[in-house]
């Protein structure tokens, strides 16, 4: 099984620059590349990655995405003087040429292909290519927007040709629309392209009508192009997560990619003069983490834009931390996406409802996508309503300050496992069996028993409680362990013990995710615990800190589970922001189809609570235990395969729960409020 992350970088790609005055191009500087690599080296991340050498892309590889005429024209640039380079650059839009840029562009494309090879040959699980010039604006016969060759488009076509791939997902989180990628694949159903980008109703570069949400692809490619336009600046962590939860991830799981390529532009981060957005660098840790379970972990991240050197370096580090499997940082202050973001999300979901099962129910349940455009009076940009003056100077992106991201240190032990007595289990790397229970742990077990379980005498159950407390202490108090898995016999007692111990000191909030029927003794009315229950029997919820999802068994059970996970459970969980996640599987649940997605849920919920996840499995099921340990250890999870359409009853149930809870948990919202 592949493991590790590749890092591809060569300082040679920094050896070109703007040779004349051009305000539109002056922000694209060599330091973008060197600062990114230096940040990785300073934080010890470059040293933890597998260094893969750069190579030049061949002409045949470049011609996968570009015309011979364009390639021949670019090949002439090394022999041009400055005046000739200026004249050549003026043929295109917002791009400059240099005598060394052809060489660097071949290296950038070749580095991207090296990354694809490393991932597809399973030499590594994933990786990042730090490249320059960027590529996503470049078109078949035109340079554009600092881009010469379209690195990601070439990579996708190369992967299709060399590895016989039928489904590639390209995620473009750069703040500009990657129109070059869209043009390349808009008729190709084998490539799903998702781009969010600053648009402002076509007033922002590249000012194209085809960058709007209504451009869904052409012919056989209809539905495989998803544009999510940002129609105002200042988008936040909440807006980005809402886009992932309510648009990208449902479609991505339905598409079931064999490879994920990210056009990673970090001009969508806070402080960037191009994007003028407010999302923190830490958000890229989570965006990366949320994509990693797809395609059995095969993920290639390729640098695009990013023009604030501070937020660029921080964002690159956050991305690579997640690729390496380090615990994700907690993000506080999440809530409802802004009205402008919700309008775009709603419009995308509506226009894509003809193509994706995840959205098919929206034709009846959501409003017409042709809503009036938001302006400053109803949720649109307000920047122009307060002109700058000496007493009220308008802040630029460079004036914004934000806290330095906290260090993300991997625990010395990834996963501690407590199987049933007598069961031998071969553990993945960086996992270990729990040791003997300490004297202090034994005393804590006795204290909890005396206080809550006077009549408990079963030594096996008491031993389980000791193991639970021991693992929790190593996770929460010493940070020695990231997560754990304990097989228990009495679920009720075990859950009560875990919550009692966790809430006494280290964890101010605990998220409980319970897969199974029957009641758990969990109190949620004090706001310290949020309970999610996924079951097959009807239950009634009244508390805003409880979410019960009764899914109908059958062929669409997996699709229903994933829709609930992505559209309901994760939004609530991220906003709740727990310090600990308690994942629980009841004895009967292991025998249902729910277990096919348990591994994916276990992976995804580790984005919460800095990865502090304790799973309790009732009874011994070898396959379930191995699946759980594999997911906790960060190993790749097998794809689910294409998802079936949801049952109408499940859709209705989920929408009722969304309506019930979204007033309290705003990240559930995916439509603009009508009030």
Swiss-Prot record:
Its EC number is 3.5.1.48, 3.5.1.62. Keywords: Cytoplasm, Hydrolase, Metal-binding, Nucleus, Zinc. One of its GO terms (molecular function) is acetylspermidine deacetylase activity. Its main location: cytoplasm. Pfam families: Hist_deacetyl. GO terms for biological process: epigenetic regulation of gene expression; homologous recombination; macroautophagy; polyamine deacetylation; spermidine deacetylation; swimming behavior. Zn(2+) binds at residues 174, 176, 267. CDD domains: HDAC10. GO terms for cellular component: cytoplasm; nucleus. It comes from the Eukaryota. Signal peptide: none annotated. It is found in: Cytoplasm; Nucleus. The record marks 274 as: Substrate specificity. Substrate binds at residues 22, 94, 307. It is an enzyme of class 3 (hydrolase). The keyword Cytoplasm applies. A motif (Substrate specificity) lies at residues 23-26. Residues 362-399 are annotated as: Disordered. The active site is at residue 137. It catalyses: N(8)-acetylspermidine + H2O = spermidine + acetate; N-acetylputrescine + H2O = putrescine + acetate; N-acetylcadaverine + H2O = cadaverine + acetate. InterPro entries: HDAC_PDAC (IPR050284), His_deacetylse (IPR000286), His_deacetylse_dom (IPR023801), His_deacetylse_dom_sf (IPR037138), Ureohydrolase_dom_sf (IPR023696). Polyamine deacetylase (PDAC), which acts preferentially on N(8)-acetylspermidine, and also on acetylcadaverine and acetylputrescine. Exhibits attenuated catalytic activity toward N(1),N(8)-diacetylspermidine and very low activity, if any, toward N(1)-acetylspermidine. Has a very weak lysine deacetylase, if any. Belongs to the histone deacetylase family. HD type 2 subfamily. This is Polyamine deacetylase HDAC10. The lineage of its organism: Eukaryota, Metazoa, Chordata, Craniata, Vertebrata.
């Amino acid at each position: 099984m592949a493991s590790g992350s590749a890092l591809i970088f060569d300082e040679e790609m920094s050896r070109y620059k703007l040779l004349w005055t051009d305000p539109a191009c002056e922000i694209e500087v060599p330091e973008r590349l060197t600062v990114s690599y230096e940040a990785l080296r300073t934080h010890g991340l470059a040293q933890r990655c597998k260094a893969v050498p750069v190579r030049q892309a061949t002409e045949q590889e470049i011609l996968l995405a570009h015309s011979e005429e364009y390639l021949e024209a670019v090949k002439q640039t090394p022999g041009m003087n400055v005046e000739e380079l200026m004249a050549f650059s003026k043929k295109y839009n917002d791009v400059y040429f240099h005598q060394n840029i052809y060489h660097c562009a071949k290296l950038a494309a070749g580095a991207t292909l090296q990354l694809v090879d490393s991932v597809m040959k399973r030499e590594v699980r994933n990786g990042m290519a730090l490249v320059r010039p960027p590529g996503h604006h470049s078109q078949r016969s035109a340079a554009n927007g600092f881009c010469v060759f379209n690195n990601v488009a070439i990579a996708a076509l190369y992967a299709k040709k060399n590895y016989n791939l039928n489904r590639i997902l390209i995620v473009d989180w750069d703040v500009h629309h990657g129109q070059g990628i869209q043009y390349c694949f808009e008729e190709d159903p084998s490539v799903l392209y998702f781009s969010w980008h600053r648009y402002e109703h076509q007033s922002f570069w590249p000012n194209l009508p085809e960058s709007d949400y209504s451009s869904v692809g052409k012919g056989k490619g209809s539905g495989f192009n998803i544009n999510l336009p940002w129609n105002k600046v200042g988008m936040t962590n909440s807006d980005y997560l809402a886009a992932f939860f309510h648009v990208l991830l449902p479609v991505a799981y339905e598409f079931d990619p064999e490879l994920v390529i990210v056009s990673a532009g970090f001009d969508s981060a806070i402080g960037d003069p191009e994007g003028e957005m407010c999302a923190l660098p830490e958000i890229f840790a989570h965006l990366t983490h949320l994509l990693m379970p797809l395609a059995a972990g095969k993920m290639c991240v390729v640098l695009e834009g990013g023009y604030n050197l501070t937020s660029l370096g921080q964002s690159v580090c956050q991305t690579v931390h997640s690729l390496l499997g380090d615990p994700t940082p907690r993000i506080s202050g999440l809530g409802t996406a802004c009205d402008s973001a919700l309008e775009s999300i709603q419009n995308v979901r509506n226009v894509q409802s003809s193509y994706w099962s995840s959205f098919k129910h929206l034709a009846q349940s959501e409003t017409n996508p042709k809503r009036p455009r938001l302006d400053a009076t109803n949720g649109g940009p307000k920047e122009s309503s307060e002109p700058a003056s000496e007493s009220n100077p308008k802040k630029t992106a460079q004036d914004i300050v934000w806290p330095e991201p906290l260090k993300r240190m991997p625990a010395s032990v990834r996963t501690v496992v407590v199987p049933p007595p007598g069961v031998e289990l071969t553990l993945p790397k960086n996992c270990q069996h729990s040791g003997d229970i300490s004297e202090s742990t034994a005393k804590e077990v006795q204290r909890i028993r005396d206080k809550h379980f006077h009549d408990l005498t079963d030594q096996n159950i008491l031993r389980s409680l000791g193991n639970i407390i021991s693992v929790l202490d190593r996770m929460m108090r010493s940070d020695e362990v990231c997560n754990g898995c304990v097989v228990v016999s009495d679920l009720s007692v075990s859950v009560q013990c875990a919550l009692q111990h966790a809430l006494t000191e280290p964890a101010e909030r605990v998220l409980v995710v319970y897969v199974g029927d029957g009641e758990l003794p969990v109190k949620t009315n004090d706001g310290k615990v949020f309970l999610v229950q996924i079951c097959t029997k009807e239950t009634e919820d009244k508390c805003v800190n409880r979410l019960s999802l009764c899914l109908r068994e059958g062929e669409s059970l997996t699709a229903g589970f994933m829709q609930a996970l992505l559209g309901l459970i994760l939004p609530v969980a991220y906003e709740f922001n727990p310090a600990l996640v308690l994942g629980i599987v009841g004895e009967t649940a292991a025998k249902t189809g729910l277990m096919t997605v348990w591994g994916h849920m276990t992976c995804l919920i580790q984005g919460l609570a800095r990865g502090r996840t304790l799973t309790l499995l009732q009874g011994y099921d070898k396959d379930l235990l191995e699946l759980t340990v594999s997911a906790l250890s960060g190993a790749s999870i097998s794809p689910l395969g294409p998802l079936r359409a949801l049952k109408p009853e499940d859709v209705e149930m989920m929408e009722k729960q969304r309506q019930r809870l979204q007033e309290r948990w705003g990240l559930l919202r995916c439509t603009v409020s009508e009030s």
